[in-house]
Amino acid sequence: MNPTTRWVSILLFAAALAVSQIAAAAENFNRQDVTFTSVGKKLVGWLYLPNGIKQGEKRPTIVMAHGWSAVKEMYLDDFAARFANGGFVVVVFDYRNFGDSEGEPRSHIDPSMQIEDYKNAITWASLQPMVDGNRIGIWGSSYSGAHVLHLGAFDRRVKCVVAQVPLVNAMDNFRRLVRADHFPGTQAWLAADRTEEYTTGKINYLPVVDEQGKPSALPTQDSYDWFIKTGQTRAPKWENRNTVRSLELALEYNPGANIHLISPTPLMMIVAQHDVLTPTDLAIEAYGRARDPKQLVILSGGHFDAYTGSGFQQSSMPALNWFKQHLMK
């Protein structure tokens, strides 16, 4: 080996070692696979425990789950790691019908069921010996951002809320994504699906995302790009489908209607500046109806930029600091 090659090899080895040491130092927690029940079904999740929890010590805790059809492997581990490194116990889980959790029909999205799963996750967390049940925060993104708005308004066990790029009014949202002349046909299609399921028991499905011009639940280009890439690289068990009934249930969902009831629980909303999936102006209008204490964070980019790169820093650090401010007093 000539001297130049040898020195390049040494430098590359030193750089790799430094990166590995930084990564190891950054992970000041351990993660455990956990299960708990919700309405008789087993939910599967992760429990993050910060290093240094003393015997008998109880830590503030963050409970979190994903948005429309997504599973925990789709970047929730990055957010949970950030919060755990900040000293929080973190519970991450998949809803009934998704991921490794039980429940039928598969890929069926019912907001009331998912909110119930959140409530049961909070209950389970509060029973763990290292959890302070009086210092529980919740985090949600997109469709689960809607869920945490609802929970924050009605579940007083929750002491802090972070809603990232949340859905605030599904009907208003839907009218932005679907042409007005297509709307009556969509309603007729949903009614026909209900009739078919009622008379035959058949469960019909629709892709979560598809190529432009093809029917899907999330008909934006950035939705297609993110779900297909993230599913392939991080969550091979993710299924690109949801029940047709899921859309009908979503259209009746208006979590922003009660946003004023979240107070006095602290609320942070993280809104993307160029969000075409859960439109920016709808989220900001809802935030305006929330009462103090509250904080608005504007994220550069679109809906899915919150999960990676600089967008992850812009979304996760304010969330961590908000939880610290209100749960680590």
Predicted regions mapped to residue ranges:
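Conserved alpha/beta-hydrolase "acid-adjacent" motif
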Residues: 276-282
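Conserved alpha/beta-hydrolase
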Residues: 82-102
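Alpha/beta-hydrolase-fold enzymes
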Residues: 149-229
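The serine-hydrolase catalytic nucleophile loop
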Residues: 69-81, 95, 281
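Short beta-strand/loop motif that positions the catalytic acidic residue
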Residues: 262-263, 269-271
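Catalytic nucleophile-loop/oxyanion-hole region of alpha/beta-hydrolase
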Residues: 72-75, 98-137, 309-315
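Catalytic histidine neighborhood in serine/cysteine hydrolases
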Residues: 290-304, 318
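N-terminal cap/lid segment of alpha/beta-hydrolase-fold proteins
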Residues: 26-57, 110
